[in-house]
Amino acid sequence: MKVLVINAAFRDGSRTAELLRRVMKEYDGHEIHEIKLSDRHSAPQPLDGDLLRLYNAAVGSRDFSSPMFAPASMFAAADEIVIAAPFWNFSIPAILHDCIELICTQGVTFDMSPEGEYFSLCRAKRLTYITTAGGYIPENDHAFGYIRDLCESFWCIKDIRYIKAEGLDIYGADIERLLDEAYHG
């Protein structure tokens, strides 16, 4: 099984990275590919004016040979996907959003029928979203909601697992216990 990990947990001592490490034990022996968003050389670049023009031209001509399409190609080819990102300002880190914008490439991860209906070009049937928060994540969680909506609308991924550890910065919090409870449900 080919597993793609999109890792937006790059702070030293990251509790999201620790939770990801625990989850990844489930995938021992599998083929793992990782997009490490902390690596400036390999992390996707934001679609600014110049890059957006190149992106649109390539999508229009269905030429996905540019390295900017690597995240989308990796996503489409994965059997399972794991995304790890801290809960920031009621959402996801900007660098993860930049990566997702490139993953949402028509002709690579999804396409549209002549009637205007989206259909998936992805192999994955399962996505695991991992997050941690110092406080408590509200019910109307924009971060997971965004990922879930993309899974259901564009990628036809119905098995969506949400692993979250919250309240980690609350005075007296037992961080190890909270991480264990998040992982073991």
Segment roles from a protein language model:
Residues 62-66, 108-113:
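Short gly/ser/thr-rich secondary-structure transition/capping motifs
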Residues 138-185:
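Glycine-rich phosphate/pyrophosphate-binding loop and the adjoining helix
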Residues 9-12, 134-138, 168-169:
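Short histidine/acidic/glycine/proline-rich micro-motifs that form metal-
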Residues 1-85, 90-101, 181-185:
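N-terminal beta1-alpha1-beta2 submodule of the flavodoxin-like/Rossmannoid cofactor-binding fold
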Residues 8, 37, 131-132, 165:
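Cofactor-binding loop segments of dinucleotide-utilizing enzymes, especially the Rossmann-like FAD-
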Residues 112-155:
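Short, glycine-/small-residue-rich phosphate/pyrophosphate-handling segment
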Residues 2, 31, 125-126, 159:
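Residues at the starts of beta-strands that form the adenosine-phosphate
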